[in-house]
Amino acid sequence: MAIPEFTMRQLLEAGVHFGHQSHRWNPKMAEYIFGARNNIHIIDLAQTVPLMHRALQAISDTVAKGGRVLFVGTKRQAQDAVADAAKRSAQYFVNSRWLGGTLTNWKTISGSIKRLRHLDDVLNSGDASAYTKKERLTLQRERDKLDRSLGGIKDMGGLPDLIFVIDTNKEDIAIQEAQRLGIPVAAIVDTNCDPKGITYLVPGNDDAGRAIALYCDLIARAVIDGISRAQGDSGIDIGAASRPLREDLPAAQATGFQGLSGPRGTPDDLKKLTGVSGDIEKKFNDLGIFHYWQFAELDHDTVLQIGEEVGLPGRADGWVAQAKGLTAEAE
């Protein structure tokens, strides 16, 4: 894998060079504007190309180090592209209304995510029959409302390491929260936007559907490149990793790790570990891992084997240190 390649012709065909009407411009974007045609500002793609490459490299590097990327695009024409790109690259997204405090008040957001998970469990289990039709409808509406806002981040397990934004004017609250927390921001910045505070600025049209689809595709491919690099750095045979384990090998035997038959008391929230989603947590449970202290006691080779077993070899390196910290907090 490598950083995704693209050409200036692709940018032109997608309409990336079209800015806003010249009277709606932000003077701070002057250095990125080539000129004006029919009162429409034309973005200088000779600058967009290297700046996009820089952003793609930063995103790939972030993921290669085990980081999480949050895609943010709540405008109508960006919603589907943002969600599809995030899902395709196993990352996270917000494509409905940004809830104030999503980053800066993560503790409260985590509580809402727990509520969403609880509603999912209730509505998808036999317990739903214990409620009246009206009560089930009320629960379903609450669940749908939470899912629209939090469905794309319910498996994130913590703050992202970088956010990618379409339309910095519309997503200004998200950007402000990221800046307060020191989280890098990669963003498409149109001629009517303020480039201040954007870590990886990419001048471009943030309204055209084709342009947005191109941006999201490039970012998703950069993320996938980072995942591949992480696997390569860990010495994982990516081709072999794509083949299923032999069915006659029990999971514990495949990893050389002896897990527990069940949790000792209340299981810990393993989704707090880097890159761990709800599905990965279930795989840990299948291996007999329910608690932080189990990770804290593992040696380097064993945790890498477990990471390979659950499909996250590139992110396993930091789990032991994280688990030790979480164990100490719990005590």
UniProtKB/Swiss-Prot annotation:
Entry's Gene Ontology molecular function annotations: structural constituent of ribosome
InterPro entries: Ribosomal_uS2, Ribosomal_uS2_bac/mit/plastid, Ribosomal_uS2_CS, Ribosomal_uS2_flav_dom_sf
GO CC list: cytosolic small ribosomal subunit
Family: Belongs to the universal ribosomal protein uS2 family.
Record GO biological process: translation
UniProt xrefs under HAMAP family: Ribosomal_uS2_B
SUPFAM superfamilies: Ribosomal protein S2 (SSF52313)
Descriptive protein name: Small ribosomal subunit protein uS2
Keywords: Ribonucleoprotein, Ribosomal protein
Pfam families recorded: Ribosomal_S2
Top-rank taxon, per record: Bacteria
Lineage, uppermost ranks: Bacteria, Pseudomonadati, Pseudomonadota, Alphaproteobacteria, Hyphomicrobiales
Organism for this UniProt entry: Rhodopseudomonas palustris (strain BisB5)
